[in-house]
Design a protein with these regions (language model features):
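SAM-dependent transferase fold signal centered on methyltransferase-like domains
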Residues: 1-439
């Protein structure tokens, strides 16, 4: 039995027990096998194409946890080519081929050369190779480097070159001059002993110290940052930022992507993108705006209680991260409920317009069922009429858990994100309200 067969045979076993009884398999590196099994479990839904091939080597479980998913890697490839990202479901519905499924670079991109300075497990390189003529994979970690050398050719990436250089101001010029990339990608690793770090200068390589060296060579620079990073601060720290992408997948804000272009001195465009959901055929697939547009946007505010049949919109994680709170109202004809509530309502007609456009992939739409002034009587009435509803408190002196306890919604049905009924307690411009709504 070889290592691959062992991994497949024991992929559902308890890993601690497997390692404890390693003597049963003297010809197998059981510790390595356990690490690979753990990594494969993380890749099963994240990068299902890799999981499907048992010969794909995943030597570090942590790398599998931290690597891009198929969708977020394909999103980066779309940014690299200047395309708006479309999820695979959209292309399947339109009888097209998604970026994630391309095997031949489109004619306009045949000359594109991409250098990935922080190759890692290689998922991003795998997607870059489908839209570029040549890709440079660079990684200092030896197990990851060896795994990528085996995995990427097996995955059909015949246009990838491999390098194992420690990126620094002294080594980077030679690497760039030899490969001559059009775009450089970097996903700096935290070097903080497990402590959360949201500053690029606290990561390795220090892209802040290298950005001028890259841009001065005429290369575009694409940098992945923590979704917790402060957008305004990043725009002050980095130069020539043309686009900043806030990427959502599976209901979470997964990453920030800064796209820098040599010589660009205009205002950065913020792009809210969803790497995990399909978008309507008439949508561009993202929401684009500048901080200046958000500042100048004049939102509409509710002047009376929302009525049954109206639509309630709750922005998703990426749209909320972008800070486009006034622009949502001004651009899509929705009314803000309150200054800090970040909920919006509108007529069925205006909501239909938003649903068919760019808002659909970036939040949840509800139909309002009932509205009442916030108070003890309304809480008792809602608890009786809407048992088991999900509960959210916005701009109130109590949090969602406290409101849930008042409504006793946990007593008959466990609160979960799949509930069709949602009760919002909201501080609005016209006072505090309880709103019952249906997905």
């Amino acid at each position: 039995m070889d290592l691959c067969d062992f991994i497949i045979e024991h992929e559902n076993d308890d890993l601690s027990s497997l390692v404890l009884h390693r003597d049963r398999w003297p010809g197998i590196d059981v510790a390595l096998a356990a690490e690979c099994i753990s990594a494969r479990r993380k890749l099963r839904y994240k990068v299902s194409e890799w999981y499907a091939d048992p010969a794909i080597i995943c030597p570090l479980s942590l790398s599998a946890e931290q690597c891009s998913s198929t969708a977020t890697a394909a999103y980066k490839a779309a940014v690299a080519t200047g395309r708006a990202y479309r999820s695979r479901k959209f292309f399947e519905r339109a009888s097209c081929v998604a970026v994630a499924e391309r095997t031949v670079p489109p004619p306009s991109q045949k000359a594109l050369r991409i250098a990935d300075l922080t190759g890692g497990l290689g998922v991003d390189c795998w997607q870059f190779s489908k839209v570029a003529s040549a890709v440079l994979y660079n990684e200092m970690n030896h197990p990851l480097f060896e795994a990528a050398q085996a995995n990427l050719p097996r995955l059909g990436c015949g246009n990838v070159e491999f390098s194992k250089v420690c990126i620094s101001p002294s080594t980077l010029p030679g690497l760039l001059d030899a490969f001559r990339p059009d775009l450089v990608f970097a996903d700096p690793a935290r070097r903080s002993g497990g402590r959360k770090v949201f500053l690029p200068e606290d990561c390795s390589p220090d892209i802040l110290a290298l950005q001028d060296m890259i841009l001065d060579r005429g290369c575009r620079l694409l940098v992945k940052l923590s979704p917790m990073a402060d957008i305004s601060l990043m725009l002050r720290k980095f130069h020539n930022v043309k686009e900043l992408h806030i990427v959502e997948a599976d209901g979470e804000c997964k990453e920030l992507l800064l796209l820098m272009e040599p010589g660009f001195d205009g205002e950065c465009t913020l792009v809210v993108g969803n790497a995990g959901r399909s978008v309507p055929p008439d949508s561009t697939g993202d929401i684009r705006f500048t901080l200046g547009e958000e500042k100048a946007a004049e939102p509409a505010f509710i002047s009376r209680e929302p009525e049954p049949g109206q639509i309630l919109f709750e922005p998703g994680a990426a749209l909320s991260k972008s800070g486009a709170f006034n622009l949502i109202s001004a651009r899509f004809g929705l009314e803000k409920l309150g200054k800090d509530a970040h909920l919006y309502c509108g007529s069925q007609l205006s909501a239909d317009s938003a649903i068919s456009g760019a808002l659909a992939p970036f939040g949840k739409f509800y139909e309002i069922l009932e509205t009442a002034p916030f108070g003890n009587q309304a809480i008792r009435d809602f608890a009786t009429r809407w048992p088991g509803a999900d509960v959210t408190a916005r701009a109130l002196p109590i949090n969602s858990k406290a409101l849930q306890e008042k409504l006793k919604s946990g007593s008959k049905k466990k609160q979960n994100s799949d509930s069709q009924i949602h009760i919002f307690g909201v501080g609005t411009f016209i006072g505090r309200l309880l709103i019952a709504a249906s997905r």
